[in-house]
From Swiss-Prot:
Documented EC number(s): 3.1.3.-
Biological process per Gene Ontology, one example term: bacterial-type flagellum-dependent swarming motility
Domain of life: Bacteria
Protein known as: Probable phosphatase YcdX
4Fe-4S as UniProt keyword: no
GO CC term, one of those recorded: cytosol
Binding site for Zn(2+) 3: E73, H101, H131
UniProt keywords, alphabetically: Hydrolase, Metal-binding, Zinc
Length: 245
């Protein structure tokens, strides 16, 4: 098991079922050292208000030896790469994930989907692209992976895509992983938990990575320090409370 999980949702996204405290308890039980809460951006119908993200600044950084990153799974809104995260939200957040969600950006043709994703990557506002292997959104995988490597944005392999949602993602995710490997980019693993019980579960992701001989040194979840070094290389100030994770 990797000790870092970068994608999960709380009851603030009302189709999810666990609280921050639930995730902390599960992290302690499973040996997770660092995790990110990434509730859906406010343009989703049942997402939290933007104040929810701004007020994450009141959270403790570490509880019982478990580090907590303040994050969002923002929505890609258009071909210009605009996302539903702005202003004071950026000031309060450590981790910005962004991806396609049908209520905000309906599936388009391959060229349009690719343009929107690459524009988001190039914007400098995003650390990780969520579930880029979604079969409903055809993309130019090679072009996206090369853009992500150039701009130091990780592409996610999402465990939930193989179990609960986005059925038919396997072939696309293998292609994404292979393209990131060839481009020298980063992969992020996400449980995409909507209930704390699945936190830290990456078994299906690892099957995808093993199938393409993906180099472990390019997986962000291997250690808290690797993930924090990545975020700091993207401009995040070092967080003193995380020094001993």
């Amino acid at each position: 098991m990797y000790p870092v999980d970068l994608h999960m949702h709380t009851v603030a996204s009302t189709h999810a079922y666990s609280t921050l405290s639930d995730y902390i308890a599960q992290a302690k039980q499973k040996g997770i050292k660092l995790f990110a809460i990434t509730d859906h951006g406010p343009d989703m119908e049942d997402a939290p208000h933007h104040w929810h993200f701004i007020n994450m600044r009141i959270w403790p950084r570490v509880v019982d030896g478990v580090g907590i990153l303040r994050g969002i799974e923002a929505n890609i809104k258009n071909v210009d790469g605009e996302i539903d995260c702005s202003g004071k939200m950026f000031d309060s957040l450590d981790l910005i994930i962004a991806g396609f969600h049908e209520p905000v950006f309906a599936p388009h043709d391959k060229a349009t989907n690719t343009q929107a994703m690459i524009a988001t990557i190039a914007s400098g506002n995003v650390h990780i692209i969520s579930h880029p292997g979604n079969p409903k959104y055809e993309i130019d995988v090679k072009a996206v992976a090369e853009a992500a490597a150039k701009h130091q944005v990780a592409l996610e392999i999402n465990n939930s895509s193989f179990l609960h949602s986005r059925k038919g993602s396997e072939d696309n995710c293998r292609a994404v992983a292979a393209a990131v490997r060839d481009a020298g980019g980063w992969v992020a693993l996400g449980s995409d938990s909507h209930a704390a019980f699945t936190m830290g579960e990456f078994e299906e992701c690892l099957k995808i990575l093993d199938a393409v001989d993906f180099p472990p040194e390019r997986i962000l979840n291997v250690s808290p320090r690797r993930l924090l070094n990545f975020l700091e290389s993207r401009g995040m100030a070092p967080i003193a409370e995380f020094a001993d994770l």
